[in-house]
Amino acid sequence: DAAVSVKDDVVEFVNEELPAAKADHDNAIGIYNAYFAGSSDQDLDAFKTSLQDTAIPAMENCITTISNIEVATDEVKALKDSYLQSVQKECEAMKMVVSAIDGENADYLTQADSLIAEAATLRSDYQTKLQAIANEQGIVVNQ
């Protein structure tokens, strides 16, 4: 096998591999955020059900999809790792919220908030790494 260039690897990862995972992710995050945006008239039990039946399985599917993506370069492996860790944190946060609703333990909500913040930091790290690779390789990234 000829060595895969960083440019080809990043383009394949972002344009071809990631979109399938991103669809699950966006769906799950939409469910999660809708409740907190106050635009939802769901009660907590309905929210818990949508997390358990739809959002968490979608996140787990997203995690599996990303985990199974094969990358050829260290640069893109670092990108994949940041993205994967951010999704894992978000999934953990959703599970914490379900536990908080079940046990009505407010500490779980605080922990979920922390996980979401960590996920945002990791996602930002991913964006920064992606932009650096794009600049280096002369690729235009549509975020």
List PLM regions with ranges.
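Short, solvent-exposed, charged loop/turn and helix-capping segments
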Residues: 56-84, 133-141
